[in-house]
């Protein structure tokens, strides 16, 4: 029997079996023709070409060869030896060559959508249509597709230390289904996470979705979570997606109000130290006995090694303007949250109170002084004026 030109590329058992079948059935007639697909499965990477092998044991009956993906009424025509245009499909051997029995094909630029079972089918020439005669057992084509770069997303709103936040990781378009996903925080592997691969059944490609739960600490401004994906299609290092905890954490400030020494006896300098807060956004208001004295927005900040910030504000108080003790309050609004505050009681010394009283007393007496002078000197002035008038009149008569 004739030997397919491309058979040297086929596995030896397949070649021997085909030759044996040909010798046993070479003159037995068309019912003995065998369609041989030697490979039950073929796996290629996306973008590569896939070779699907098929050989016949006889040229009888006369008729074309066709390739289909899938079986039954919904099968898809991949190649027709007789007619049609199939730009991605080429034949491995020269089909016009005399006594050719090799009907293997190659499909270029494979994508995950090409996955499936392919059947090599022999048709018998008929009128008006050819009739299916015999089909091969089928070759399952699986496509190895790389997963997309993992995308990590954090919580929509910030949370404070000691609270738990969730991070999600997604990757799509990979095949086969087997995949490994791990979570890390600052290089330490996490254990509190759940992962799903969809769909659950067979598919041309798959997606993975994982959610990790992370407990925040005050030192997490510089921390990072990593989603790591390993897959058979990846060469070298696994794929990684990252998220910064600085986008998820809010560290509330601590307040300390103190009085600083001053050279001037009638002035007091009170400071409000706002420490270890994150993010930057902060507004501070000073109140004197509950009344707003000044409001300012933090600008020049000092950054700590852990990524948090410090800021100091001061208030200069004229103690002479107060006869009683003053309650000074430092009120801080941070990152749009409810204001926090701390108060300081500024004591007015007895000397300052007495000094303030003297000033007030003198100021109260000052307007009455001219009146007292007028009351004391008035009669004497009137007497002098009267005597002067009499003397002038007597002088004129004389």
From Swiss-Prot:
Q: Where in the cell is it found?
A: Cell membrane
List, for all copies, the residue spans of the domain called Ig-like C1-type.
147-246, 253-347
Bilayer topology reads: Single-pass type I membrane protein
Signal sequence coordinates: 1-29
Is the keyword Cell inner membrane in the record?
Answer: no
Q: Which residues lie on this side of the membrane: Extracellular?
A: 30-371
Q: Which residues lie toward the Cytoplasmic compartment?
A: 393-398
Under the heading InterPro entries, the entry gives: Ig-like_CS_Receptor, Ig-like_dom, Ig-like_dom_sf, Ig-like_fold, Ig_C1-set, Ig_sub, Ig_V-set
Q: Which SUPFAM superfamilies match?
A: Immunoglobulin
Q: Where are the transmembrane segments?
A: 372-392
Disulfide-bonded cysteines: 54-120, 169-227
Q: Give me any GO biological process, just one.
A: signal transduction
Q: PTMs?
A: N-glycosylated.
Q: Which CDD domains match?
A: IgC1_SIRP_domain_2, IgC1_SIRP_domain_3, IgV_SIRP
* Pfam families for the chain: C1-set (PF07654), V-set (PF07686)
All copies of domain Ig-like V-type, residue ranges = 30-136
Glycans attached where? 244, 269, 291
- State which tissues express it: Detected in monocytes and dendritic cells.
Q: What does this protein do?
A: Immunoglobulin-like cell surface receptor involved in the negative regulation of receptor tyrosine kinase-coupled signaling processes. Also participates in the recruitment of tyrosine kinase SYK. Triggers activation of myeloid cells when associated with TYROBP.
Q: How does it assemble?
A: Homodimer; disulfide-linked. Interacts with TYROBP. This interaction results in the recruitment of SYK.
Q: What is this protein called?
A: Signal-regulatory protein beta-1
- Name its species: Homo sapiens (Human)
